[in-house]
C-alpha cells in the first residue's frame, strides 16, 4: 500500500469517526475566555491600577507574581483588552505592547520589539543595545501616547542578562516630554526581587499583585466551563473531569496543565475512536504531557542553566556536590567562551533546576563536617543527549570530556 493510500485511510477514518471536539482551541493557553472564574479580585485590582490612563494620566507600574498557570497572563490580557476598548470609546491615546521575555531572549530584541510597536524598523542585528533604546525612546516620544509595556516572564531575562534594561525602562519617563510609560512586569518567580537592583525594584513595584494557585475545586469549575465550549455534549465523563482537576491541583494548582490534560485526553480518545473521554484517556495524556514537559523545559532553560545541567550530566554520579559541579561548569564555560557565574549564583540555578524536577538537590548532614548539598539528575541522560544534541551550541559539549570529571570520578563521564 502506497503512502498516499495510507494517508487517505487516516484522513477518512478521522472524518468519519465519532466527533469529540466542538472547538479544541478553547483549551489552548492563549485562548482568553469571556469570563475568568476565581480571578475577579485580581481583575478588579489590575483594572483599578490601569484606569488612570483613560484620563490621560500615567498609571502606576505594577509587578505581578505567581506560579505558572495561575492566570497572570490571561488576566493581564483580559484587562488590557477591555481597557483598549474603553480608551477608544473615550478617545484616550493609549497603546499596549506585550512581550514574552523568555521567547524574546535578549535585551536587544526587547527594545527592538518596543521600537516596532511605535512604528520603527529595527534590524535584527547590527546596532548596539543603547542605540536601539535611544531610537525607541525618540520614536515613542514623537507618538504622544501613554504606552503600557507588558513584560511577561521577565524573570527569565533578568536572570540571564541582569536588570540593566529594566533600569533604563523604569527611568524612561524622566526623559520623555510628550509620551508616558507604565510597566507591567509578570514573574513566575516570587523571589525575583533578590535579582533586582533596589532602585529598579522600588520603581517597578509601585503596586504588587500576587496570584495564588487554584485549588482542585476551582480548577474543576474552570475545566467545566471550558469543556462546554470545547467538547460535544456527553463526551466528557465526570471522572475524567475530576482526575484532570486533581492532577493539576497537585502540580501547584496549574490551570495550564489542567487544560493540557483535558485537551490531550480528548485527542487520545479521538485517535482511539472512543465515544467518551475517560479517566484512562487522562492517564495516557499525563504520560504524554510529562515527556513533552521535560523536553520543553530543557529547550527553554537559560544558557547557564543548561551549562549547569550539563555539568551534572558529565559528573554521572549518584550524588555530586556544588563544588564538583562548579569545576565542570567552569570548564564548559571556557569551551563555549561564555562568562562565568559565581558559585553562589550556580547554587541558585541548581535550586531552580530542582524545582523544575530536572535534578534532585538535597541537603544532607555530614556529621562533624557540617551539612552539604547532594545533587543528582532526575531525568534520563538519553533525553539530555537527544535535546541538547540537536542544539549546535551544545552538541559538542555533550561529547566533551571534562578534565574535572576525570579528576573527581576516576574517568567516568
Regions found by a protein language model. Give the residues of each.
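Short alpha-helical segments that sit at the start of domains
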Residues: 291-311, 315-319
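Conserved catalytic segments around the Walker B and adjacent sensor/switch elements
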Residues: 61-63, 86-102
Amino acid at each position: 500500500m502506497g503512502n498516499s493510500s495510507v494517508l487517505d485511510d487516516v484522513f477518512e477514518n478521522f472524518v468519519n469517526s465519532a466527533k469529540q471536539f466542538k472547538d479544541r482551541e478553547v483549551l489552548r493557553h492563549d485562548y482568553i475566555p469571556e469570563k475568568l472564574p476565581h480571578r475577579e479580585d485580581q481583575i478588579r485590582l489590575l483594572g483599578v491600577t490601569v484606569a488612570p490612563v483613560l484620563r490621560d494620566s500615567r498609571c502606576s507600574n505594577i509587578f505581578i507574581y505567581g506560579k505558572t498557570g495561575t492566570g497572570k497572563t490571561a488576566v493581564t490580557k483580559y484587562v488590557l483588552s477591555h481597557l483598549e476598548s474603553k480608551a477608544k470609546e473615550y478617545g484616550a491615546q493609549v497603546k499596549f505592547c506585550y512581550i514574552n521575555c523568555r521567547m524574546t531572549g535578549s535585551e536587544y530584541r526587547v527594545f527592538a520589539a518596543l521600537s516596532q510597536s511605535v512604528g520603527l524598523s529595527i534590524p535584527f542585528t547590527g546596532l548596539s543595545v543603547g542605540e536601539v533604546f535611544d531610537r525607541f525612546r525618540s520614536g515613542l516620544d514623537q507618538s504622544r501616547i501613554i504606552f503600557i509595556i507588558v513584560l511577561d516572564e521577565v524573570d527569565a531575562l533578568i536572570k540571564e542578562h541582569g536588570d540593566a534594561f529594566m533600569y533604563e525602562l523604569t527611568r524612561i519617563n524622566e526623559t520623555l516630554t510628550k509620551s508616558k510609560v507604565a510597566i507591567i512586569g509578570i514573574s513566575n518567580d516570587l523571589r525575583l526581587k533578590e535579582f533586582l537592583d533596589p532602585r529598579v525594584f522600588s520603581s517597578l513595584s509601585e503596586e504588587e499583585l500576587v496570584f495564588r494557585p487554584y485549588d482542585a475545586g476551582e480548577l474543576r469549575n474552570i475545566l467545566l466551563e471550558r469543556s462546554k465550549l470545547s467538547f460535544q455534549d456527553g463526551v466528557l465523563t465526570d471522572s475524567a473531569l475530576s482526575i484532570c482537576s486533581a492532577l493539576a491541583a497537585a502540580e501547584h494548582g496549574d490551570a495550564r496543565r489542567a487544560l493540557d490534560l483535558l485537551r490531550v485526553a480528548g485527542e487520545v480518545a479521538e485517535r482511539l475512536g472512543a465515544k467518551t473521554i475517560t479517566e484512562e484517556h487522562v492517564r495516557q495524556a499525563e504520560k504524554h504531557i510529562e515527556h513533552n514537559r521535560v523536553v520543553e523545559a530543557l529547550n527553554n532553560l537559560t544558557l547557564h542553566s543548561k551549562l549547569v545541567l550539563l555539568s551534572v550530566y558529565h559528573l554521572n554520579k549518584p550524588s555530586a556536590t556544588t563544588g564538583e559541579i562548579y569545576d565542570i561548569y567552569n570548564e564548559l564555560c571556557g569551551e563555549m567562551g561564555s562568562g562565568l557565574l559565581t558559585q553562589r549564583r550556580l547554587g541558585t540555578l541548581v535550586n531552580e533546576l530542582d524545582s523544575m524536577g530536572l535534578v534532585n538537590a538535597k541537603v544532607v548532614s555530614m556529621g562533624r563536617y557540617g551539612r552539604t548539598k547532594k545533587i543528582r539528575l532526575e531525568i534520563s541522560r538519553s533525553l539530555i543527549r537527544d535535546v541538547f544534541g540537536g542544539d549546535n551550541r551544545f552538541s559538542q559539549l555533550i561529547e566533551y570530556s571534562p578534565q574535572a570529571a576525570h579528576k573527581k570520578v576516576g574517568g567516568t563521564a
